[in-house]
Amino acid sequence: MSLLAQLDQRIRHHGGLIVSCQPVPGSPLDNPAIVAAMALAAEQAGAVALRIEGLANLQAVRPLVTVPVIGLIKRDLPDSPVRITPWLEDIDALAQGGADIIAIDGTQRQRPASVSALLAEIHQLGKVAMADCSSLDDALECWQLGAEIVGTTLSGYTAEETPDEPDLALVQCLSVAGCRVIAEGRYNTPAQAAEAMRCGAWAVTVGSAITRLEHICGWYNTALKAAVCPANEQ
């Protein structure tokens, strides 16, 4: 049975939650052993797959879990805004590290390696390709180029301002177009994730709301401060 067929079964039985275990850089949680523990806990809690950034984290996670792992490497390049798995060498490293699915930036931006070249390298190594996209045009082009999965990962993150809500409209458009789409980006409540599935998502990736303690505390602190400020002003 193919990896995607196996994932289809997991999604039908468990509901389609993918957990992204990517701590805030520099956080006390930003440690491969802690990332591996989070990943194992997520699997035990019913995650159908995991999204792991960085080779050290991938190598720590892979021996502990049985669910598929989406691997990526983030880089800050001086001559390109593309951050997610920009180099062909990154794909080779992720494949050797045990990633089942390799995620790349699928946007139409200046980059060191073309999307088509990255997809070809992923397939040459026998892995499944996921394209992290920002728009309908991005995703449809990546789908036509052979990406088995397209994600709404970068929707709202390539412009100056990032919206608060997830891009459910993009999920629905991609589903109608026949794409296998993973909803990702600002799915901070179970209700939002469920709505993405109703819009046609194949699965939903949740990161900050599960594995980024600083973000979760920030949401609560903002709400609590807003609640007490009127009382303090009286």
Curated annotation (Swiss-Prot):
It catalyses: an N-acyl-D-glucosamine 6-phosphate = an N-acyl-D-mannosamine 6-phosphate. The keyword Repeat does not apply. Pathway: Amino-sugar metabolism; N-acetylneuraminate degradation; D-fructose 6-phosphate from N-acetylneuraminate: step 3/5. Its EC number is 5.1.3.9. The keyword Isomerase applies. GO terms for cellular component: cytosol. GO terms for biological process: carbohydrate metabolic process; N-acetylmannosamine catabolic process; N-acetylneuraminate catabolic process. Pfam families: NanE (PF04131). Disulfide bonds: none annotated. Keywords: Carbohydrate metabolism, Isomerase. GO terms for molecular function: N-acylglucosamine-6-phosphate 2-epimerase activity. Belongs to the NanE family. Converts N-acetylmannosamine-6-phosphate (ManNAc-6-P) to N-acetylglucosamine-6-phosphate (GlcNAc-6-P). This is Putative N-acetylmannosamine-6-phosphate 2-epimerase.
